[in-house]
Amino acid sequence: MAQFFKAKPNRSKQLSSKLSLKVTQLDHLGAGIAHHDGKIVFINGALPDETVSVQLTEQKKKFSRGKLLKIEKRSTERVTPPCPHFDKCGGCDLQHLDIEAQRKHKANTLVDLVNKFAQTQASEVCAPLSGDAWHYRRRARLATWFDKNTKHISLGFRASSSSDVVEIQSCAVLAEPLSALIPDLAFMLNQLSGKKALGHVELTQADNGNFVVLRVTKVLSDKDKARLVEFANKHEVIVLLQDDDAQCEHLNGAGEQPFYALSGSDIKLNFSPGNFIQVNGPVNQAMVSQAVEWLSPKAGERVLDLFCGIGNFSLPLAKDGAEVIGVEGVVAMVEQARVNAKQSGLDKVAFYHADLSADLSKEPWLGKVDKMLIDPARAGAYESMQSLKKLKPKALVYVSCNPASLARDSEVILKQGYQLKKIGLIDMFPQTHHLESMALFELGN
């Protein structure tokens, strides 16, 4: 049999070539989508209805990636990002898109993913829950980087897809009092003799003040601690040092713990630096209110809240007399949730610790419930959803921070006799591609 030589494609030439492409849509990560040679081309920074000049940077069998060189035809939805760090910082990736267009894109992404992978449509697509587009974050973790040559410590956020630290002077999505702290905080940290021992810095705006948590790998000197106390007093913040064991030392504030309250109730939720909270306070309030409205728990009903954290949903669900069982995988948050329930005067709520990614069949709390709420991390709750047949809630609210895992888990839920009644976007993270969502499933006849 004759064999013929077939030249391999010149990949280096293909990658170096410049193309003019028409962008048709955004993917779920916020990258522009165009097509070339029968393949999808992903272009960060490009928007739908734009014609752009692109240089290919990566070639795969089914897709390519391109670097945006020039916008030849501009989208009417493109805006100028107000943040001076936008093109370097890895935090906000949609500042160049009008906020209403952002929300429309996210809502469409959510519905499309659920329709495609769960192969179902909700009876009702609800209006998005949203708040301020800027300065909405009440919490952020800043990275530090110590330069051995200059002895300078940089304070900022990680660059996109990199461990490099982008030094910042402000943050357009961080609460304004916290953003205003950054320049003076960075200057003060550089005055510390033990600055090499600094890790990340966590800034939090709580209802009872602003908190600065410094992660340290070694004990700081008394002189350094005195500098930190001076900074705390000047800026009216509470400063804590957190060691390798996640133990915190208050430098001022007499051991005061941050908290936030939920409006319309006497519920107050204390939290610690290691505890998860939603970063967008007003949108969190709207989200909790919607979840309670959708489930409408009543006295005498039994409600299960999986991945309950410090009680963000559990306590509001219990305020009208329903028996609520909260289950969480982090021991410290279970303990905090119990404290929060006690201080809020709620005695019909109980909290348990469990690995929600493991077999739950022998858990003492597992049994028939009337209603259920689940708020998992990005990985979703595939394992927990296998227990639905035993739990048999007549209504299930699924709060998700990842539409892909929601779509996957929805398929499991639907196969167990449930119908998707409502779904809606929760715009917890404006200026980014990240989206929160809520879905209501009801057991069919």
Swiss-Prot record:
Disulfide bonds: none annotated. Its EC number is 2.1.1.190. GO terms for molecular function: 4 iron, 4 sulfur cluster binding; iron ion binding; RNA binding; rRNA (uridine-C5-)-methyltransferase activity. One of its GO terms (biological process) is rRNA base methylation. Residues 12-70 form the TRAM domain. It comes from the Bacteria. It catalyses: uridine(1939) in 23S rRNA + S-adenosyl-L-methionine = 5-methyluridine(1939) in 23S rRNA + S-adenosyl-L-homocysteine + H(+). Gene3D superfamilies: 2.40.50.1070, Nucleic acid-binding proteins, Vaccinia Virus protein VP39. The active site is at residue 401. [4Fe-4S] cluster binds at residues 83, 89, 92, 171. Keywords: 4Fe-4S, Iron, Iron-sulfur, Metal-binding, Methyltransferase, rRNA processing, S-adenosyl-L-methionine, Transferase. Pfam families: TRAM, tRNA_U5-meth_tr. S-adenosyl-L-methionine binds at residues 278, 307, 312, 328, 355, 375. SUPFAM superfamilies: Nucleic acid-binding proteins, S-adenosyl-L-methionine-dependent methyltransferases. Belongs to the class I-like SAM-binding methyltransferase superfamily. RNA M5U methyltransferase family. RlmD subfamily. Catalyzes the formation of 5-methyl-uridine at position 1939 (m5U1939) in 23S rRNA. NCBIfam families: PRK13168.1 (NF009639), rumA (TIGR00479). PANTHER family: 23S RRNA (URACIL(1939)-C(5))-METHYLTRANSFERASE RLMD, RNA M5U METHYLTRANSFERASE. This is 23S rRNA (uracil(1939)-C(5))-methyltransferase RlmD.
